[in-house]
UniProtKB/Swiss-Prot annotation:
The protein's role, per its UniProt record: Catalyzes the conversion of fatty acids such as long chain and very long-chain fatty acids to their active form acyl-CoAs for both synthesis of cellular lipids, and degradation via beta-oxidation. Can activate diverse saturated, monosaturated and polyunsaturated fatty acids. Has increased ability to activate oleic and linoleic acid. May play a role in spermatogenesis.
PROSITE patterns: AMP_BINDING
Domain of life: Eukaryota
InterPro entries in alphabetical order: AMP-binding_CS (IPR020845), AMP-dep_synth/lig_dom (IPR000873), ANL_N_sf (IPR042099)
Name under which the protein is recorded: Long-chain-fatty-acid--CoA ligase ACSBG2
Source species: Rattus norvegicus (Rat)
Xref: SUPFAM superfamilies: Acetyl-CoA synthetase-like (SSF56801)
Binding site for ATP: 227-235, 418-423, 496, 511, 624
Source lineage: Eukaryota, Metazoa, Chordata, Craniata, Vertebrata
CDD domains: ACSBG_like (cd05933)
Pfam families: AMP-binding, AMP-binding_C_3
Amino acid sequence: MTQEKKAEDPDRGMDTTSAAPRLWSTHCDGEVLLRLSKHGPGHETPMTIPELFQESVERFGAYPALASKNGKKWDTLTFSQYYDVCRKAARSLIKLGLQRFHGVGILGFNSVEWVVAALGAILAGGLCVGIYATNSAEACQYVIKQANVNVLIVENDQQLQKILSIPPDKMETVKAIVQYRLPLMENSTNLYSWQDFMELGNAIPNIQLDRVILSQKANQCAVIIYTSGTTGSPKGVMLSHDNITWTAGAMAREIELIHVSGKQDTIVSYLPLSHIAAQLMDIWIPIKVGVLTFFAQPDALRGTLVYTLQEVKPTYFLGVPRVWEKMQDTIKENVAKSSNLRKKAFAWAKMLGLKVNTKKMLGKRDIPMNYRMAKALVFTKVRTSLGLDNCHTFFSGASPLSQDVSEFFLSLDIPIGEIYGMTECSGPHTVSCKSIYRVLSCGKVLNGCKNMLYKQNKDGVGEVCMWGRHVFMGYLGKEDATLEVLDEDGWLHSGDIGRLDSHDFLYITGRIKEVLITAGGENIWPIPIETLVKEKIPIISHAMLVGDKAKFLSMLLTLKCETDQMSGEPLDKLNLEAISFCQMLGSQAVTVSDILKIRDPVVYTAIQYGIDIVNQQAVSDSHRIRKWIILEKDFSIQGGELGPTSKLKRDLITQKYKAQIDNMYSS
């Protein structure tokens, strides 16, 4: 029986014979059965990442591929140069003793060197292993050991010192460390600058590298992505060559990224490449369809992203909800400072924009004459101010986008399509874009993939399960964890609860692991309640519902604050929107401390008023928020409360603020 015939039917069950590959493996050198369809999408010929790269060079060789800022100018590499420099890096990695299916750990902000190290690792027969720049030394050590990392590529001395603080006996697999930015401050054997590292491979003949490349198979592991560990310890998600190459092609088709001679799409890389969403959008799709990737500055998320966007003017853009929320805040602050006439024009244009774009979303194309005026007066100016004036496709991913933010941008002629998925399905499972769009929906299933709602209730709500060539190989070294998410028929269980409408649009309603079960046995999904609180109370930055096994629900709140431009840490000072909110109420507060010190009565009353509105919409008494507390500091990645894509780390927050939570239930 061929692999195709075995894998085409998701109801067939696992292949349990030892002679043939199974649908899953937990070994880094394992091979899996590819889930090819009989025909159509999902039936494409499997290819390795080196084969994809070679095809890209043949098609786009002279086009620019990567661009990085050097002073005031951008240095670029063409696709041909990109491939050559990756081969050079691969030979250097072989020279350093990189073993087959062992990791190359990359620790630092997005850069040309990050991507070259990733591709170099794969060409050399190793595994690309991204390590979050915000990881502690202990977290780095866990990844190094688990992924058998042979070579570490670090950004700067700060990251180097983090690695050097790990006892050598905890890094026995590491043979060399390379620093790719800033001069080396240390001098020891097996420690190299990027320039010296790139010359090491000159002694390795090209034919030796070619043999390694030719020996690779599409059903073998190429990339390990570590889950950010919002619950429990991180797991190494093994993605095969086919996972990457097929998903990149399927996603590019879905979002209509097609290379046209003489035109080139562009993207700005700023979300951590250790995360699958950024890696797919910034590395793999660009190789597949010839996109030019610009690298933002390391402080992009601390305020400089907008300047890069204004300079580069990308044609498609992916933001996590927190990025879109920050953009929304900026627009609101600018409008608040404008004249009354401009405020009226903005409000009029928004009202018209929401009406027209909602109709467009439903397939109606009748555009009123005054829409052009709204576009000229408001929409074009907003896009230009954000650096998105050349952008044809806008996305949000990693966590749900609120209705408030989605409709705000829709009203400004910026329809944000949501991408739903997980690391374990190579990133996307459903996609919502300008041609497949509904507010609050995650769109439709990626062409060539299958969706199932497991254990549906009477309302058609069940656990989202996935099947297709995007489904991962398994968790590295964790068979029990792998079999928890892959059932006996090979379906990937997401842990997310969702429903499909009559047009097959998927809506996610909650996450099984995040559900709060009250003392009375009620199941409460926190995200809809938290989202509503943030919508109704403009001063709130983060809201986290608590009350598992408790008699009633309580909530932790943080206020919108300025952030330190250097560290990214939230400051005590309120941001402009929060200060305007206070002034509107008659409060003189300009810091969080000002509000907490005197339990500012007008601010507390306004927050309680917003909570009351949320409670009025509760489906039952058990869904109402009884108590709440304002924390002294906003949540942040640096503070540990948020993951790398700004998701709430609920377990950690619950532990960190245990005293405050206990106090709400004891008082």
